[in-house]
Amino acid sequence: MTEPGLDHTSRLMAGKKFSSAEEMNAFLRENCVGKHVTVPPAGPLQAAQDVIYRAMDAHSPRVRAHLARKALDIFPDCADAYNLLAEEEAEDDGEALEFYRKGIEAGARVLGAELEERRGELWGHFNARPYMRARAGEAHTLWDMGRREEAERAYY
């Protein structure tokens, strides 16, 4: 399942109280299997992330950057918007690093206490992926800049 599909399936299941795994699986089979699941966003963060999913599918760097800026207009703490701007608008590694660091800060604000509570397992949590992509982008960029020790610390 793609990340947008997983996101929309998660939205579909939000607030549901299943009495068993079998009941949950039956719900998923009925509502998701073989279907394109689309659930309207519950707030500005989800709306911005939906714009980011469109940007990730776009082939034009100009369109991707435009959609990233649109996502930031909707929700200024959209970490993936900064990640896309680092990829598409940064003219050098220094500028890319600034975008990734803005993404890290934005993602940390979104995650709040969850950032510390789930440290070490964040890649496994769907809502932490934009933050983790910003962290990975920062580390890769530092490595490319020859700042190896900083890059290693950023990875861990």
Segments (PLM) and residue ranges:
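N-terminal alpha-helical interaction modules that lie
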Residues: 1-121, 129, 135, 142-156
